[in-house]
Swiss-Prot record:
Disulfide bonds: none annotated. The gene is pth. It comes from Enterobacter sp. (strain 638). It catalyses: an N-acyl-L-alpha-aminoacyl-tRNA + H2O = an N-acyl-L-amino acid + a tRNA + H(+). GO terms for cellular component: cytoplasm. This is Peptidyl-tRNA hydrolase. It is an enzyme of class 3 (hydrolase).
Length: 194
């Protein structure tokens, strides 16, 4: 089993770039930077894309330029064009149920109220069986404050923890493609930024 498409969820535009909801894009941006594969806008895929070669595998990167709740349009366009199955896709997204400094891989499951995941599941023919990278951003403690929280910028102390978890997730993605998901998952799930 190999990954052929890695997606980082985000809202477009400078005003959202540093918000918690864009944590998935931070991960893809760092992966592209580390592997010297700059992202370029590709209108037919409704996003910024690049291509990397990891452990002999050809992997496409995508950061949709649609709004978060329309992310599925970009993912489905790329998956259809390159004939990529849902279980060959890794979607990185912000995760309220994990604290800053923690990131975890997961296969399948629901959308947990995340509008980006909800749209991707829908546009992949109601198929939730894609991989996810859940980047912890913490929870405001009150569900009525969630929207403002995810669209807000984390304080520098939290940003540092999120950045460290994203950095570790990039390293673990390279391990996944070279040595398999089990080894990558064991390492990532043992990590907690201090």
């Amino acid at each position: 089993m190999t990954i052929k498409l890695i997606v980082g969820l985000a809202n477009p535009g400078a005003e959202y770039a540093a918000t918690r909801h864009n944590a998935g894009a931070w991960y893809v941006d760092l992966l592209a930077e580390r592997l010297r594969a700059p992202l370029r806008e590709e209108p037919k895929f409704f996003g910024y894309t690049s291509r990397i070669n990891l452990a002999g595998a050809d992997v496409r990167l995508l950061v949709p330029t649609t709004f978060m709740n329309l992310s599925g349009k970009a993912v489905a366009a790329m998956a259809t064009f390159y004939r990529i199955n849902p279980d060959e896709i890794l979607v990185a997204h912000d995760e309220l149920d994990l604290p800053p400094g923690v990131a975890k891989f997961k296969l399948g499951g629901g959308h947990g109220g995340h509008n980006g995941l909800k749209d991707i599941i829908s546009k992949l023919g109601n198929n939730p069986n894609f991989h996810r990278l859940r980047v912890g951003i913490g929870h405001p403690g009150d569900k009525n404050k969630v929207v403002g929280f995810v669209l807000g910028k984390p304080p520098s102390s939290e940003q540092k923890l999120i950045d460290e978890a994203v950095d570790e997730a990039v390293s673990c993605t390279e391990i996944w493609l070279q040595d398999g998901l089990t080894k990558a998952t064991n390492r990532l799930h043992a990590f907690k930024a201090q």
